Structures are given as structure tokens and as C-alpha cells.
Amino acid sequence: DVHSNDEIGYLAASLNYMANELNTLEEDQRKFVSNVSHDFRSPLTSIKGYVEAMLDGTIPVEMQDKYLNIILFETERLNKLTKSLLELNKFGSHGVMLDITSFDINHTIRMTVQTFEGTCMEKHISFNLILSGETLFVSADFSKIQQVLYNLIDNALKFSHANSAITIETTEKNEKVFVSVKDTGIGIPKDSIKKIWDRFYKTDLSRGKDKKGTGLGLSIVKEIIQAHGENINCISTEGVGTEFIFTLPLAKEQKEHA
């Protein structure tokens, strides 16, 4: 950087400003690529696992329809992620593009939970679903909320003990839907809770348990929820467990049927 009080100094300041703007743009692009890489890996791992299990006979022929439906669900996720990648140039320097529709959050939770069946069987972890009503429609970006659920459940599984349960609950209050993902795992140290939303951050407790993780999952979650104008909170006690609660707007048709 050049510093001076004359016109050359002013020109240098302008050039410095432009250089900083370019660096910001590059950082946003790097951030986007990091997000997409993280989100691609999850469904690909799921698809690979189920196909291998069908080929080696772990999944019997009579059960294959169920798992083929899960694979189809995951390929649809990949298709949506690919479209997001192709829309890279539409992203603002500080924004997430949202495609707002009405969809059933309860059904989305059930389908997302199914994709973790293999991991759950390995670790003997079960899901306890406490869903408000048979259907519960929200107004949000379907594929991005799917990413949020996937990342939160993946996180809960990673840090849960064997033979434990993860509770996912939906409740409706004041035209908002509250979604909670709660585990009874290792918990997060008090001094780390504020840092968990930072990119690439991992607590000392998680480093040994999450060798393959990028430290991006929760920062992606927060960015998506904030882009919707909603909130996400974390309640955690070390050695007891962690709960993530986020809000979404209730869909118009859900209000009319209330």
C-alpha cells in the first residue's frame, strides 16, 4: 500500500480500494465453492453406500425399492446443487439466492432422516420424531432448508454416542414454525458456542471425532437461515448434549387451514 497526501496518494488509495474489492469478490467465490463441495459430498457418500450395500447383498432384494427411493431423493438433491453451481454468477457479493415455495417441512424431515439410516444402524442411533400434525407447510427455499436439515442431523450423528437417540421436533407458534434438532452427545464447551458459526472452526472436542469434516456445515446453516430473515440458536451443555432450533415462516395455505 502507498500512503501520501498528494494526488498520487489519492490514486494509490483508489487502486488499493479496487484491489480490496477484487479480493472480496475472490473470497466470495472461494466461499461459494467451499459450500458447494461440502454439500456435494454428503449425498454422494449416501448414494455410494447404498449402491455398495445392494451390490454386496447387505440390502436384500425385497428391500431394494425403499433404498432406490432414497437414492432417487439424493440424486434430486445433487441436481439442485448442480443448478446452484451453474447460477454462481447470479450470487450477489453478500447474498444467497432463494427460490421461495410452500412445502411440507414434516415430510422433508422424514425423507432427510431416511438418508442417514446406514450411519444410524452402524452406531445404533435412533430418531425420535415429534412432528406437529401430519403435514406442516412452510414458506422457504426447499433445497436450501434440506441442506440445513442435512447438516444439522449430520452434525448430531457425528457427536452422538452409540445407543442414543436424536430428537427432531416441529412446533407452530405465532405464524412461525420452530424446528429443533437435539442430541445427547458430547456437547459444546461454553467458550466455543459463539465460534461454531465461523467457517472452518472446530472445537477441541470435535477434532478427534470429525477428521473428515470441513468445519463448514454450521456456517452454511446460519447463512441460509439468515438469508430467509429467520433465526437459529444453539443450546448446549458439555457432556449432556446439544440442541439447534431454527424458525421458518408458516406458509399461507397452512394459516388458512389453521
What are these regions (language model features)?
Residues 188-202:
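Short conserved segment of the HATPase_c
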Residues 229-230:
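Conserved glycine-rich
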Residues 156-157:
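Short helix-loop "hinge" at the ATP-lid/N-box region of the Bergerat-fold HATPase_c
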Residues 73-78:
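Short alpha-helical segment of the dimerization/phosphotransfer core of two-component systems
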Residues 93-98, 137-140:
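Conserved micro-motifs of the catalytic ATP-binding
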